[in-house]
UniProtKB/Swiss-Prot annotation:
EC number: 3.5.1.2
Family: Belongs to the glutaminase family.
Reaction catalysis annotation: L-glutamine + H2O = L-glutamate + NH4(+)
Official protein name in the record: Glutaminase
PANTHER family on file: GLUTAMINASE
Transmembrane regions listed in the UniProt entry: none
Keyword Chloroplast: no
Record: residues binding substrate: S66, N117, E161, N168, Y192, Y244, V262
A Pfam family this chain is assigned to: Glutaminase
Subunit structure of this chain's protein: Homotetramer.
InterPro entries, A to Z: Beta-lactam/transpept-like (IPR012338), Glutaminase (IPR015868)
Keyword flag Lipid metabolism: no
Length: 308
């Protein structure tokens, strides 16, 4: 029988996971991320029937980083036909590091999926082509989905990432050489880094991503965020490609669609039931939150939830 969810259960999971602190490494490739304390632990759940649970540092905001790639894809789905998106970016796992150029060169500038850096940059390039103010549009959508009006970009993080953008710029220019990048590289990179610099808490992330647990419907909004088939497709991509090259191991241990970021956050979806957000800044070798994955593993075992 599945366990009933409550805050005490979440607190107990955090207590069990806390000994893992110190085994991972906080992202240090930009100073703004390296300064975050590694001992943070947070978890939040929002359910489709309107319940909300939280424990630990669930109300503290952090840099969501690559979790934003899901949101930029959702925005693109609202402004492009399906074939327009998928002729420029694939739907398959890459099996390579998220910032690899090797596979991109071999496959002639078409990224494997929208959740590696190359794929997310193509999506951002598409948004630049179709939206007059892509950064403002993203902020509006996140604030609307979360119901929180003061969510914002962290300009220090965005600037720091832009100052250390050589590899991402190389990815963009390589795709441009293959005709799969249409706008000014610096402009699109600025948009991309601003999306990554969004500061949100576990509580805000769980509420923001709840639409993916309910066939594209956010409970507090009048219109669907995306169509039911699109919600299913996004969840499928999260399952196969949301945890970088560790997607298979994560499916084995947790069994849910999820997306991670190097800020230490992970969002996971239990279809038709709930959205879960966890945060622990120390990362494993693949760039996923070490304690965050363990939290989700404990939680799914305790709840008896999995898509398998």
């Amino acid at each position: 029988m599945a366990t009933v969810i409550n805050n005490a259960m979440l607190e107990a999971i955090l207590a069990e996971i806390r000994p893992l602190i110190g085994r991972g490494k906080v992202a240090d490739y930009i100073p703004a991320l390296a300064s975050v304390s590694g001992d943070k632990l947070g978890i939040a759940i929002s359910t489709v029937d309107g319940q909300h649970f939280a424990a630990g540092d669930a109300h503290e905001r952090f840099s969501i980083q690559s979790i934003s790639k899901v949101l930029s894809l959702v925005v693109a789905m609202n402004h492009y036909q399906e074939e327009e998106i998928w002729q420029r970016v694939g739907k398959d796992p890459s099996g390579q590091p998220f910032n690899s150029l090797l596979q991109l060169e071999i496959e002639q500038g078409k990224p494997r999926n929208p959740f590696i850096n190359a794929g997310a940059l193509v999506v951002c390039d598409m948004l630049q082509s179709r939206l007059s103010a892509p950064r403002q549009r993203m902020l509006e959508i996140v604030r609307r989905l979360s119901g929180v009006a003061d969510i914002a970009y962290d300009p220090v993080v965005a600037r720091s990432e832009f100052e250390h953008s050589a590899r991402n710029a190389a990815i963009a220019w390589l795709m441009k050489s293959f005709g799969n990048f249409h706008n000014d590289v610096a402009t699109v990179l600025q948009n991309y880094f601003h999306y990554c610099s969004l500061e949100m808490s576990c509580v805000e992330l769980a509420r923001t991503f709840l639409f993916l647990a309910d066939r594209g419907i956010a409970p507090h909004l009048d219109a669907p965020v995306i169509a039911p088939i699109q919600s299913r497709q996004v969840n499928a991509l999260m399952m196969t490609s949301g945890m970088y090259q560790n997607a298979g191991e994560f499916a084995w241990r947790v069994g849910l669609p999820a997306k991670s970021g190097v800020g230490g956050g992970i969002v996971a979806i239990v279809p038709q039931e709930m959205a879960i957000a966890v945060w622990s800044p120390e990362l494993d070798d693949a760039g996923n939150s070490l304690a965050g994955v363990a939290m989700l593993e404990k939680l799914t075992q305790r709840m008896g939830r999995s898509v398998f």
